[in-house]
UniProtKB/Swiss-Prot annotation:
This is Alpha-elapitoxin-As2a. Binds with high affinity to muscular (alpha-1/CHRNA1) and neuronal (alpha-7/CHRNA7) nicotinic acetylcholine receptor (nAChR) and inhibits acetylcholine from binding to the receptor, thereby impairing neuromuscular and neuronal transmission. It is found in: Secreted. It comes from Austrelaps superbus. It comes from the Eukaryota. The keyword Disulfide bond applies. CDD domains: TFP_snake_toxin.
Length: 92
């Protein structure tokens, strides 16, 4: 009986460990499991010289902490699987 209980505890711990990786989008169609220690998905958008023609530039990915916003850069962060989809661009 003790062996069965110990086996169940070990299996539970192993199963919980395997499901820890956060899944974030890294481009408009691709997502990946973040490496250990990176528990935040981010979306970073900004305008460059081609913004009026092509829309805002977009970076997606995983991070350990939410990146610090810089002037002219919008950043959103979240911590659930696939919570950072590629933003829809407004056509001009």
């Amino acid at each position: 009986m003790k062996t069965l209980l110990l086996t169940l505890v070990v299996v539970t711990i192993v199963c919980l460990d395997l499901g820890d990786g956060l899944i974030c989008y890294v481009d408009s169609k691709t997502s990946r499991t973040c490496p250990p220690g990176e528990n935040v998905c981010f979306t970073e958008t900004w305008c460059d010289a081609r913004c009026s023609l092509l829309g805002k530039r977009v970076d997606l990915g995983c991070a350990a902490t939410c990146p610090t916003a810089k002037p002219g850069v919008d950043i959103t962060c979240c911590s659930t699987d696939k919570c950072n989809p590629f933003p829809t661009q407004k056509h001009r």
